[in-house]
Swiss-Prot record:
Gene Ontology MF: a single term: glycine dehydrogenase (decarboxylating) activity
Family from the record: Belongs to the GcvP family. N-terminal subunit subfamily.
Entry keywords, A to Z: Oxidoreductase
Catalytic activity: N(6)-[(R)-lipoyl]-L-lysyl-[glycine-cleavage complex H protein] + glycine + H(+) = N(6)-[(R)-S(8)-aminomethyldihydrolipoyl]-L-lysyl-[glycine-cleavage complex H protein] + CO2
Protein name per the record: Probable glycine dehydrogenase (decarboxylating) subunit 1
GO biological process: glycine decarboxylation via glycine cleavage system; nucleoside metabolic process
Function field: The glycine cleavage system catalyzes the degradation of glycine. The P protein binds the alpha-amino group of glycine through its pyridoxal phosphate cofactor; CO(2) is released and the remaining methylamine moiety is then transferred to the lipoamide cofactor of the H protein.
EC number(s) reported in the record: 1.4.4.2
Amino acid sequence: MRYLPLTEADRRAMLDVIGAKSVDDLFRDVPPSARLAGPLPLPSHQGEMEVERAFTRMAGKNLSAGCAPFFIGAGVYRHHVPAAVDQLLLRGEFLTAYTPYQPEVSQGTLQMLFEFQSQVATITGMDVANASMYDGATACAEAAIMACRITKRNRVIVSGGVHPHYAETLETSLRFTEMEADVLPPDPLGMEDMIGRVDSKTACVVVQNPGFFGTVRDLRPLAALCHEAGALLVVMVAEPTSLGLIESPGAMGADIVVCEGQSLGMGLNFGGPGLGLFATRDKYVRQMPGRLVGQTADVDGRRGWVLTLSTREQHIRREKATSNICTNSGLCALAFSIHLTMLGGTGFGRLAELNHLAATRLEQKLRAVKGLRVLPQSYYNEFAVHLGDDADAAAVVDALADKGILAGVPASRFYPTWPELKPVLILAATETNTEDDMDRLVAGLQEVL
């Protein structure tokens, strides 16, 4: 296929249609400081060996998660991923992100997605799940939009315990619609009260459990409050391994459950890729976005799998589709499914226990640090700590990084305009953390505080 570039007349005609004066107008939302004004300053051409050495030197400046005590979480978590997961992903029949439109030649992929859906529905306590979304943030936004369609209301209340990136993505998705997001202030103590906020105009309440600051809460009272007002409860789960220990959102009354699936099957990859999980009640299935794989039988009575309820989707009814998300995170869904299958039900529960035990052990050790206090009263594998009124959590993190310790995420990174959160540090502990890791963190905190 030949590449035919646009002429200046072509560009001018396209810009006129959208009302832009120049190509630069298309990038006006990008801050000038982030734009490249001239050619990229690359060195002269080099051989493969020289380039490899240069990149190796650059990589040597990084402090790898596997080479240091690692307590960073805040939405992405370090877990052990069995080597078999990546090996199975490399099989030719799976190594694609393409949607299997032709069931007669895609039974393996369709069966995998069907089993993935079944696993997601089981761990979330819901009736039905789709074949994945892009990531947890987009799944959260799509859930809010779905709730507005179902209730025919426009107001979305977002708990202060929801990850700020999820809240920002939700706000972006609603910005040019009639829907509005009411994002509550950050809630490090898990004490916010929804009474008086949920009313007849509320489409849904979006809450994260465990929360961004680590709080685990009983969602039943909130579910009852929402349902009494005719609103839906959307539950976001950023750490899906918690579902092996905490009662499922479905059992606590959630109407829609969305998750970030990165913890199972995927490692830490500079922020991606992620995996969005999306589950709901049977009665809302026709309003659910994303692909849906169903089980059927062919003319000979043999069991098979097909894409079902496809009239909800943009490739069938573009202008009336529930979402524009289509081909998305199928390979990541397979990684999630393989990892969860290898664990099994008992192993999944045991993994969750190990994570909670690691966090509990870390909390006990942190009691030796003068002036430090743990904020959540209940948590899973992550909690926020207050380092003292005069402490700067960001400076503490930098000081410990210089000592070879990756000591969590300062809350001020996400809330720079909230001075009361400057001393707050978010720490995560998983099955990968050792006693020595925890002792080094405690010793480091005692030294720098």
